[in-house]
Design a protein with these regions (language model features):
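Extracytoplasmic
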Residues: 1-24, 101-105, 220-228
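Extracytoplasmic gate region of multi-pass secondary transporters
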Residues: 11-12, 198-245
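Intracellular juxtamembrane helix-capping segments at the cytosolic ends
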Residues: 99-113, 325-340
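Conserved MFS/SLC helix-loop-helix module at the cytosolic interface between two early adjacent transmembrane helices
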Residues: 42-84
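Helix-loop-helix hairpin linking two adjacent transmembrane segments in secondary transporters
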Residues: 118-177
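Hydrophobic core of transmembrane alpha-helices in multi-pass small-molecule transporters
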Residues: 83-100, 297-328
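Central cavity-lining transmembrane alpha-helices of secondary-active solute carriers
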Residues: 31-49, 245-257
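C-terminal ends and interior cores of transmembrane alpha-helices
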Residues: 65-80, 277-306
């Protein structure tokens, strides 16, 4: 979960770098994120088939190798100064993130026994996910300094850190034993199954909900960063990275709440409440004038909090982190409930 958030989170501050290094539009600066998540559409079903055929462990190891290569390509884009190579790296990284999500989510839900307990375990792991997401924008914002002069190569330490994490986790995972409850046995593979996860209506609705959720979860901090660093607002990239880091920090707080009460509160109630409050926050952010400013506590690079003056809309976008935090686990838990052998 930490690796997923760390690598996915790189696309957010990289959007600022790409915008300035290649004089890209806001749309082009977000294509890295788009490429990262479009990869899910290509890899989702193959990843599930891999999980059934070779199991959790081998699928995860393969995902780590692909992720290492994806981050390596991102590093090469800085060396070559190529926008196309940057997009390729983001796309390849997306393959890895999709495969890792395919492994960790059903595994945690299964280990928790499904239901509220399964949701609780996913929320605990999600807290670790949020730690990685909190670190990335703060770290890269600190590394690039002046956004107008930022280059992809300035963020090399973050890329090296990501590759190092991949390498360490690969070694640790290679030496571990992991249960394989969803691996299809050879005799079962020969018998065609007329049904699949797509036979369940709630699974299809869950897949649509996850698709929409990911766009919201990642889109909020991305456009918050673009808005904060725009000439009209003029917030320093390092400070903007800290503001975005606060969004992810609030996601961690929300997931710790979900982990604490996930066994007592149903996924449906938790999801409905979070979505309603999140919509209210977004509406306030949309209609609040940019000239109205407030002092907002932000998570800084020295692992402390400081006060920064921001438009009130940015503060409410950051507060959305509390709402989006528990939505992934709730959606996934409800979507796979009762799938049995089709969970993978």
């Amino acid at each position: 979960f930490f690796m997923i958030s760390f690598v996915t989170g790189l696309q957010n501050p990289f959007g600022i770098i790409v915008k300035n290094q290649f004089a890209a539009s806001n749309f082009m600066s977000q294509l890295g994120n788009a490429a990262n998540f479009i990869a899910y559409a290509f890899m989702g079903i193959p990843a599930g088939m891999l999980l059934q055929k070779i199991g959790y462990k081998k699928t995860a190891l393969l995902a780590i190798i692909v992720g290492f290569c994806g981050v390596g390509i991102s590093y090469l884009s800085g060396v070559a100064g190529s926008y196309a190579v940057y997009l390729t790296g983001a796309f390849v990284s997306g393959f890895s993130m999709c495969m890792l999500n395919t492994v960790v989510n059903p595994m945690l839900n299964t280990l928790g026994g499904g239901g509220n307990k399964g949701n609780q375990l996913i929320q605990v792991a999600g807290s670790v996910n949020s730690i990685g997401a909190t670190i990335v924008p703060v770290l890269v914002g600190y590394l690039i300094g002046d956004a107008a002069k930022a280059q992809i190569s300035d963020a090399n330490p973050a890329l090296f850190l990501a590759m190092g994490i991949f390498a360490i986790v690969f070694i640790v995972l290679f030496c571990m034993q992991i249960p394989e409850p969803h691996m299809v046995k050879e005799n079962e593979a020969k018998t065609p199954d007329k049904h699949s996860a797509l036979s369940f209506r709630h699974f299809i609705l869950g897949a649509i909900a996850i698709f929409l959720y990911v766009g919201v979860e990642v889109g909020i901090p991305n456009f918050m960063n673009l808005f904060a660093t725009s000439p009209e607002i003029g917030i320093d990239p390092t400070v903007a990275g800290s503001i975005v880091g606060t969004y992810w920090f609030l996601m961690m707080i929300g997931r710790l709440f979900g982990a604490s009460f996930g066994a007592k509160i149903s996924s449906k109630a938790m999801l409905s409440s979070a979505a309603t409050v999140g919509m209210i926050f977004i509406l306030i952010a949309i209609f609040a004038p940019a000239t109205t400013k407030v002092s907002m506590p932000v998570f800084l690079s020295d692992i402390s909090f400081g006060m920064v003056e921001v438009p009130v809309g940015i503060m409410f976008m950051a507060l959305c982190g509390l709402c989006t935090s528990i939505m992934w686990g709730g959606i996934f838990n409800l979507a796979v409930e009762g799938l049995g052998k089709y969970t993978a």
